[in-house]
Amino acid sequence: GVVGIPRVLNMYENFPYWATFFKELGFRVMLSPQSSHQIYELGIETIPSESECYPAKLAHGHISWLIKRDVPFIFYPCIPYERKEVPGAGNHYNCPMVTSYSENIKNNMEELKEKNVKFLNPFMAFTSEAVLSKQLQEVFKKEFDIPESETKKAAKKAWDELAQARTDVEKKGEEVLQYLKDTGKHGI
């Protein structure tokens, strides 16, 4: 089958995980495009409040884009906790918008029901490989009858891929910082 992944909020940051996870389970992954004014306008009618941050408002357009491409299944989980990236950090909570914005989408986008899209947004903790894997095993057994052993294997590969992607980004960041230092240029 096909799974739609909206390129929004923490889904963007954790995309290496989700892409690998779903490919390992045999899904074809369709990622919404980069954010733009056109994407924003696609979902503007379903935004329930002007007080939401712009990145959250963009989520409506990304979901609409996927729906307009007849994606039968969209995955956008609620993630209250991320990995603790810095030892000694006081917390590793996501902001309330990131934590549960897919609930807002589910309750304000009638297109999901009208087009009979399976919108899966379970609450999950991204705190560790073991915790996330166990939660995914339960969800995908219940929703798709995928054996827990298959989901566990896919989750392991996905966790390793995310770790490698983060290492690659860190390495590139160090290269850029060294370049700026060597050339006397400035960067943000």
Language-model segments: what does each one mean?
Residues 1-187:
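An N-terminal assembly and electron-transfer interface module characteristic of large anaerobic redox
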